[in-house]
């Protein structure tokens, strides 16, 4: 029998061994069945885990998500460790069957948010560890099922806020770790009912102040005695940008000289140790209203916006009091914003009066009044010459609603009125309106449109026929917000008077005028093109003028360089060769001198050196002789060497003198008006100028045919 029991025991052990997942260690002999799968390189939760497991450790693996079936039917599981994995998603109701779970470790994963049903069913959970994740959002109902929590660790995340309402309900909570987040505010009264709280860590957040709470008074006992007991409380708030004013005076009065918290503001206390600052330096600045609306006049039915701004330390809260002395809060016709602006959506005649703006903080309060005048709409006179004013009804502007309600959520009437009027299209200067309301008002004469801009309190009126379904508003300013209302002017059947009724109001903003910028750019572009074209034309004209000047100069230079090549002229008196002398032949004389040769030419030879020595050439006292000029001039260039040697002989002085006399006589007879003038210059007075153009050219010599001169002289004597 004993052997049989032993065999059964071995079979049971073998069966249990087969249930244990691969790579995991199962402690089946311990009173509490434990499955240890830490650091096994698992990519998912093993599916063959014993459902009776009490402790399951899956830390330091590579599990990426948790599915609904992973922990199904594990009703005995008490401790679940999923730390240091790569979990980024948990299926809703994934832990719903773990009704006996006491501790859930999800630290050091990649969770970014906690949804509503992630922790559903964990009614007995005591320890929830979520530190070192990437949490940015926690749903407002995420902790509704974990009200029995004793420890909640949300440190080292990116949280700006947490569901404080859910925290208030965790009456068993004794440790709350919120350090190293971005929390900037803790609502007042959050810890009022957490009497079991023994430790609160809000280190390294963005808190500027801590709300006073009786819970924090127990922190002084821990600081002075150093003994942790159920009645003591450990508070850690270092690393926050504390604003050291009168709101933290209660905290300064606690004796915690062992901590090193510092102040970040105001400027006089920046960087100083919190516990070393005297209490009298924790000051607050009373509020001061710096800007507010002094007076406003609006038309009946128009929207009125009253502004009030104040400064102080701490930031003052702003409230409005109606002319009737009632506190104004969000209602059907009024909206109060956090920045101190009061917005009356549709004004009535009873809204006329003085509204009071009250700015208050712990240091005091300040008040200012704003006068609001409601302009009555024009009405026609009846037969008795009395103006009928329809009753605007009782004002509900001071009707209180739930405090702290969202201004935008109580805008039902405005939304309905905006549905009646729609801006179909809005440009920078126009807006197309469409009317969707039903014309069920009998006796409508016309519709009146009233509008004004954000920066202009002047109302603009437009009258349109009652059959109009659209209307185009012109001459609007670009980038401006407009408040527009449509009123129906009709005949009241009861009083037989003309009455008005607000049909609806709407607010719209015109577009920015980008077209104007493009127009300016096109203007600049056109001007630039005109300048460029004009410059091209001017440059072309200048180039044309320069070309003409260069061409004219070249022609003149070519005319000056055309010098007639003539033979050297030798004086028949002394036979000396005359060089560099200028010869001037008038046109009539040249024609007579070339009488026997039709192709002869006469040129003017002018030398710059001869001009420089003109004084010597023109001397009357010097003994000069004239050279005999033959009737024909020949160039020295084509003359052969033999001819040069012939002309090189020096004739006697007497025949030359006679030849000159005969030539002069002949010229006188042939031309009565012009005589041949020969300017002679001594050889010694001729110098060659260095800058003259003819200085580098070989001087042309004038050669005289002596034989022809002698024959001509004899012919003249015979005559």
Swiss-Prot record:
LRR repeats, residue ranges: 52-73, 76-97, 100-121, 124-145, 148-169, 172-193, 196-217
Chain positions carrying an annotated carbohydrate: 73, 330, 339, 382, 406, 452
Membrane topology term: Single-pass type I membrane protein
Primary location recorded for the protein, binned into one broad class: membrane
Domain Ig-like: 287-373
Cysteine pairings via disulfide bonds: 308-357
Domain LRRNT residues, every copy: 18-51
Residues covered by region (Disordered): 385-416, 614-719
SMART domains xrefs: IG (SM00409), IGc2 (SM00408), LRR_TYP (SM00369)
Transmembrane segment boundaries: 530-550
Tissue spec: Predominantly expressed in the brain, with a weak, but broad expression in the cerebral cortex and diencephalic nuclei. Strongly expressed in both the pyramidal layer and the dentate gyrus of the hippocampus. Also detected in other parts of the central nervous system, including the olfactory bulb, pons, cerebellum, and medulla oblongata, as well as in the peripheral nervous system, such as the ganglia of cranial nerves and the dorsal root ganglion during gestation.
Domain Fibronectin type-III per the UniProt entry, residue ranges: 414-503
UniProt keyword Glycoprotein present: yes
Regions of this protein lying in the Cytoplasmic compartment: 551-719
Secretion signal span: 1-17
GO annotation (BP), single: negative regulation of macrophage activation
Subunit description: Can form heteromeric complexes with LRFN1, LRFN2, LRFN3 and LFRN4. Able to form homomeric complexes across cell junctions, between adjacent cells. Does not interact with DLG1, DLG2 or DLG3. Does not interact with DLG4.
Free-text note regarding domains: Lacks a cytoplasmic PDZ-binding motif, which has been implicated in function of related LRFN proteins.
Protein's name in the database: Leucine-rich repeat and fibronectin type-III domain-containing protein 5
Annotated source species: Mus musculus (Mouse)
């Amino acid at each position: 029998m004993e052997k049989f029991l032993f065999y059964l025991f071995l079979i049971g052990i073998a069966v249990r061994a087969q249930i244990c997942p691969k790579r995991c260690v199962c402690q089946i002999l311990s009173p509490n069945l434990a499955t240890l799968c830490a650091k096994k390189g698992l990519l998912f939760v093993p599916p063959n885990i014993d459902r009776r497991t009490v402790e399951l450790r899956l830390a330091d693996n590579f599990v990426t998500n948790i599915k609904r079936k992973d922990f199904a039917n594990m009703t005995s599981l008490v401790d679940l460790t999923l730390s240091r994995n790569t979990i980024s998603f948990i299926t809703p109701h994934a832990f719903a069957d773990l009704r006996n779970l006491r501790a859930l470790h999800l630290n050091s994963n990649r969770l970014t948010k906690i949804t509503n049903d992630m922790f559903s069913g964990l009614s007995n959970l005591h320890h929830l560890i979520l530190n070192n994740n990437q949490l940015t959002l926690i749903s407002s109902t995420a902790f509704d099922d974990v009200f029995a929590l004793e420890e909640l660790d949300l440190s080292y995340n990116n949280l700006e806020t947490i569901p404080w309402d859910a925290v208030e309900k965790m009456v068993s909570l004794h440790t709350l770790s919120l350090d190293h987040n971005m929390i900037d505010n803790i609502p007042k009264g959050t810890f009022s009912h957490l009497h079991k709280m023994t430790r609160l860590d809000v280190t390294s957040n963005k808190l500027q102040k801590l709300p006073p709470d009786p819970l924090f008074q127990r922190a002084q006992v821990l600081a002075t005695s150093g003994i942790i007991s159920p009645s003591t409380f450990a508070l850690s708030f270092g690393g926050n940008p504390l604003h050291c004013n009168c709101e933290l005076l209660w905290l300064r009065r606690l004796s915690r000289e062992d901590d090193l918290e510092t102040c970040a503001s105001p400027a006089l206390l920046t960087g100083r140790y919190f516990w070393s600052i005297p209490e009298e330096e924790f000051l607050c600045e009373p509020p001061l209203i710096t800007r507010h609306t002094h007076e406003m006049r609006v038309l009946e039915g128009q929207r009125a916006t009253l502004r009030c701004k104040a400064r102080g330390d701490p930031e003052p809260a702003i409230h409005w009091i109606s002319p009737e002395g009632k506190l104004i809060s969000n209602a059907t016709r009024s909206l109060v914003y956090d920045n101190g602006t009061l917005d009356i959506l549709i004004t009535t005649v009873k809204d006329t009066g003085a509204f009071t703006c009250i700015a208050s903080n712990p240091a005091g309060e300040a008040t200012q009044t704003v006068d609001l005048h409601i302009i009555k709409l024009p009405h026609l006179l009846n037969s008795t010459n009395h103006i009928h004013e329809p009753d605007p009804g009782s004002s509900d502007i001071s009707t209180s609603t739930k405090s702290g309600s969202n201004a935008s959520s109580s805008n039902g009437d405005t939304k309905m009125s905006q549905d009646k009027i729609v801006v179909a299209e809005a440009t920078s200067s126009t807006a197309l309106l469409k009317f969707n309301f039903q014309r069920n008002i009998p006796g409508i004469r016309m519709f009146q449109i009233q509008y004004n801009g954000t920066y202009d309190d002047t109302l603009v009126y437009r009258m349109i026929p009652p059959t109009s379904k659209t209307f185009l508003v012109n001459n609007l300013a670009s980038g401006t917000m407009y408040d527009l209302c449509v009123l129906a002017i009709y005949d009241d059947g009861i009083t037989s008077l003309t009455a008005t009724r607000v049909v609806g109001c709407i607010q719209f903003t015109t577009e920015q005028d980008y077209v104007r910028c493009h127009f300016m750019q096109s203007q600049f572009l056109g001007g630039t093109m005109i300048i460029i074209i004009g410059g091209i034309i001017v440059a072309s004209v200048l180039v044309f003028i320069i070309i003409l000047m260069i061409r004219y100069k070249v022609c003149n230079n070519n005319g000056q360089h055309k010098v007639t090549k003539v033979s050297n002229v030798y004086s028949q008196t002394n036979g000396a060769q005359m060089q560099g002398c200028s010869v001037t032949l008038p046109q009539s004389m040249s024609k007579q001198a070339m009488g026997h040769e039709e192709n002869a030419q006469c040129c003017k030879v002018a030398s710059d050196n001869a001009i420089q020595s003109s004084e010597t050439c023109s001397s009357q006292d010097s003994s000069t002789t004239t050279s005999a000029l033959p009737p024909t001039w020949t160039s020295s260039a084509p003359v052969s060497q033999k001819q040069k040697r012939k002309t090189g002989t020096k004739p006697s002085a007497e025949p030359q003198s006679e030849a000159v006399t005969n030539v002069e006589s002949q010229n006188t007879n042939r031309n009565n008006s012009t005589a041949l003038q020969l300017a002679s210059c001594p050889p010694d007075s001729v110098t060659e100028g260095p800058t003259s153009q003819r200085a580098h050219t070989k001087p042309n010599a004038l050669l005289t045919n002596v034989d022809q001169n002698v024959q001509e002289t004899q012919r003249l004597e015979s005559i």
